[in-house]
């Protein structure tokens, strides 16, 4: 770290007392709680001054970290009997912090389109599958919002996506005291003790509100930073008219302000997000020409049948992790048809119906189809992206069209090249989940085989990172969330297992009694030297 980096502690004046009472009623006496607003809903977790050693710091405060916070709350209030024996939670409330780069809690806010539904049952919320008695169930949220009866009248397990985000915001509001927003973590650095063993980690973050770099120390660090938008080559990553699907709701309002204008728009991708964007554009920009470019021959339905859904059972995580690596890789490829590059059947049928109506209005022949305002173009690959000489400020897509190889009614179909000039292109090509590799760069010397090019961090079944033997103390470590699909299965990046996994994480993180910096735990009182 540069010696000129501005450090901001953000902690209250005055040191903590030498002796603190042990855990009693979820409060610590050395914290002035008058600095926090009175909250209608408040978790059992309390603010820890920034300069104190934390038991846990979570990098990111999305659904994965939220599930950990919910499980901690349930463990402390006694409603979750499965966590009643966690030793590290017996003497005092844990000292935790969640660092989130966004200014407030948000979940896929850029894809909260009108009418969009969840793709999993509301019962797979932040708590129900682990602790149905929790205050954080979706049903309790509905009860608190006075909508339980009306929701029951909908006769559905699939709430609107906008309502489910509001549910998660409601859950997140309980933890305002321990969440620092606008904090973008930039590195996690190991710290050695006098014995040479790593006993804590320094979490460095950039405060977007102050512009300063801040530092916090923790024994346990959970990296749950989520995915970053994947804009693959040849698309430029910083062009104002090349927009990732995660920003669609925001950017479409800026780029496509006139709903009656004759825009030229392209959507790239063959999954749920691409289909939703294509359908939204068709419905809201009727005078535009919209093209959905897919690499295969057709949009394919997701498989959410009961037997296939067992892939996402929490117990399947054990099965997946314990498989031989080659078998695990094979089954992951088989399972991806349930979630990757597929679309819910109801939306597929709706899109097909809207395209069919164009056959009635504009004609059914191939020549007439070429002039439809909204089309799906199969077997297309974008080979290059340049500035458009036709659409002001837009881009030209240089496309390889392989459809003749598959759809030609005569032998000898040939690939051809085509160009599409568009005012905007929306790229629905998923996410990359590799931020932990960057954050842990200063710990790479602790990675087994870390000197080898291309070596990746490996985790145990409880998501704990494998470090070189005896390099990191038993009471310290790093855990990964949402980037372990190759070892823990397809559900790793999904909502399906969050409630159960949150409980597993609490047990793994706090199984042992917490200690102060000197390592002492003394009866009902914890002593610092």
From Swiss-Prot:
It catalyses: L-ornithine + NADPH + O2 = N(5)-hydroxy-L-ornithine + NADP(+) + H2O; L-ornithine + NADH + O2 = N(5)-hydroxy-L-ornithine + NAD(+) + H2O. Induction: Expression is repressed by the transcription repressor SRE1 under iron replete conditions. NADP(+) binds at residues 270-273, 339-341. The keyword Ion transport does not apply. It holds the Pfam family Lys_Orn_oxgnase. Substrate binds at residues 124, 309-312, 339, 496. One of its GO terms (molecular function) is ornithine N5-monooxygenase activity. It is an enzyme of class 1 (oxidoreductase). L-ornithine N(5)-monooxygenase; part of the gene cluster that mediates the biosynthesis of hydroxamate-containing siderophores that play a critical role in virulence. Cochliobolus heterostrophus produces extracellular coprogen-type siderophores including coprogen, neocoprogen I and neocoprogen II, as well as the intracellular siderophore ferricrocin. The role of extracellular siderophores is to supply iron to their producers in planta and the intracellular ferricrocin is required for intracellular iron distribution and storage with a crucial role in ascus and ascospore development. Belongs to the lysine N(6)-hydroxylase/L-ornithine N(5)-oxygenase family. This is L-ornithine N(5)-monooxygenase. It comes from Cochliobolus heterostrophus (strain C4 / ATCC 48331 / race T) (Southern corn leaf blight fungus). The lineage of its organism: Eukaryota, Fungi, Dikarya, Ascomycota, Pezizomycotina.
């Amino acid at each position: 770290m540069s010696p000129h980096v501005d450090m901001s502690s953000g902690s209250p004046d005055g040191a903590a007392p030498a002796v603190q009472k042990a855990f009693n009623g979820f409060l610590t006496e050395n914290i002035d709680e008058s600095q926090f607003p009175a909250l209608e809903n408040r978790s059992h977790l309390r603010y820890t001054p920034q300069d104190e050693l934390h038991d846990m710091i979570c990098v990111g405060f999305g659904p994965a970290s939220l599930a950990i916070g919910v499980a901690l709350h349930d463990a402390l209030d006694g409603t979750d009997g499965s966590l009643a024996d966690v030793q590290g939670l017996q003497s005092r409330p844990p000292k935790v912090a969640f660092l989130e780069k966004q200014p407030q809690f948000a979940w896929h806010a850029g894809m909260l389109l009108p009418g969009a539904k969840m793709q999993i049952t509301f019962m797979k919320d932040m708590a129900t599958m682990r602790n149905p008695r929790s205050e954080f169930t979706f049903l309790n949220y509905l009860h608190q919002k006075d909508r339980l009866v009306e929701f029951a009248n909908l006769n559905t397990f699939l709430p609107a996506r906008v309502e489910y985000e509001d549910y998660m915001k409601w859950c997140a509001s309980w933890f305002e005291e321990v969440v620092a927003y606008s904090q973008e973590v930039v590195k996690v650095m190991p710290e050695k003790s006098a014995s040479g063993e790593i006993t804590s980690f320094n979490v460095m973050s950039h405060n977007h509100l102050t512009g300063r770099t801040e530092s916090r120390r923790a024994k346990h660090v959970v990296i749950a930073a989520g995915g970053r938008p994947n804009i693959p080559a040849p698309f430029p990553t910083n062009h104002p008219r090349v927009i990732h699907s995660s920003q669609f709701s925001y950017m479409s309002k800026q780029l496509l302000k006139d709903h009656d204008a004759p825009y030229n728009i392209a959507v790239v991708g063959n999954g749920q997000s691409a289909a939703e964007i294509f359908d939204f554009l068709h419905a809201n920009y009727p005078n535009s020409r919209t093209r959905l470019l897919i690499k295969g021959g057709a949009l394919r339905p997701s498989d959410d049948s009961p037997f296939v859904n067992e892939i996402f059972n929490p117990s399947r995580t054990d099965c997946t992790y314990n498989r031989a690596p080659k078998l695990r890789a094979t089954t992951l490829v088989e399972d991806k048809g349930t979630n990757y590059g597929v679309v819910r059947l109801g939306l597929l049928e709706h899109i097909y119906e809207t395209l069919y109506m164009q056959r009635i209005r504009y004609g059914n022949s191939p020549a007439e189809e070429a002039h439809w305002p909204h089309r799906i173009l199969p077997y297309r690959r974008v080979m290059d992206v340049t500035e458009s000489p036709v659409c002001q400020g837009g881009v030209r897509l240089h496309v390889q069209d392989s459809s003749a190889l598959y759809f030609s009614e005569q032998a000898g179909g040939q690939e051809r090249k085509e160009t599409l000039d568009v005012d905007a292109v929306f790229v629905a090509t998923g996410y990359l989940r590799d931020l932990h590799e960057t954050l842990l760069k200063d710990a790479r010397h602790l990675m087994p085989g870390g000197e080898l090019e291309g070596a990746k961090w490996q985790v145990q079944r409880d998501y704990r990172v494998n470090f070189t033997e005896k390099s990191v103390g038993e009471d310290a470590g790093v855990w990964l969330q949402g980037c372990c699909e190759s070892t823990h299965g397809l559900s790793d990046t999904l909502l399906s297992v969050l409630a159960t996994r949150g409980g597993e994480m609490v047990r793994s993180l706090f199984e042992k009694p917490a200690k102060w910096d000197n390592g002492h735990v003394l009866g009902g009182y914890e002593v610092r030297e």
